[in-house]
Regions:
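Bacterial N-terminal signal peptides
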Residues: 3-16
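The canonical Cys-X-X-Cys-His
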Residues: 150-161
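Extracytoplasmic c-type cytochrome modules immediately beyond a signal peptide or single-pass transmembrane anchor
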Residues: 20-149, 163-172
């Protein structure tokens, strides 16, 4: 009986100690770029891959003489349709970065907590996955559909947060 009571007390004490342990602090990633820099450095070049694939067959690009240093995704070591796939995944991952608190180019906080911002980031992520699937499909119709969804996702957010009256003062 004493043994059973000792075991029960040890378990209760262990639970009490575990329950009182402080939660590990949530660490926010360090931010280096404002929203404009993030967009221009990541989404702009990656979206141009799918927009180029609308008018030029990714498989028709000739590999660059120095593929490992080519700045053109289509002629690089990971060119052709793989460039379309990679741009889709890069944009989907970048969508996560658009939710990290940071500054707009005008110094104001980016609206990352706004419901519409979050909704449009989800739309961007979904469109980016569509770009990835278009690269896998290697099909012009799928590319056109993916490019349209991506352009629409960008337009929704840009209409409110980029192309605004008052210029840079009011934009993110």
């Amino acid at each position: 009986m004493i043994r059973v009571v000792s075991i029960v007390l040890a378990l209760v004490w262990g639970e009490a100690v575990y329950a009182q342990a402080p939660a590990a602090p949530v660490v926010q990633p360090r931010v280096y770029a404002n929203m404009l820099q993030l967009m221009r450095g990541t989404l702009y070049p990656q979206s141009n891959v799918i927009f180029t694939a609308q008018v030029e067959d990714p498989a028709a690009f000739k590999p660059a003489a120095h593929q490992s240093t080519s700045s053109d995704p289509f002629t690089s070591a990971y060119g052709g349709w793989e460039a379309v796939e990679n741009s889709g995944m890069a944009m989907a991952e970048t969508a996560n970065l658009l939710l990290v608190p940071r500054q707009c180019s005008n110094g104001k906080p980016a609206p990352v907590q706004n419901a519409d911002w979050k909704m449009w980031i989800d739309e961007l992520r979904e469109a980016a996955v569509g770009v990835y699937k278009a690269g896998q499909a290697k099909n012009d119709d799928v590319v056109l559909e993916a490019a349209d969804k991506l352009a629409t996702a960008c337009l929704h957010c840009h209409a409110k947060y980029r192309n605004v009256p008052g210029g840079n003062v009011n934009r993110c």
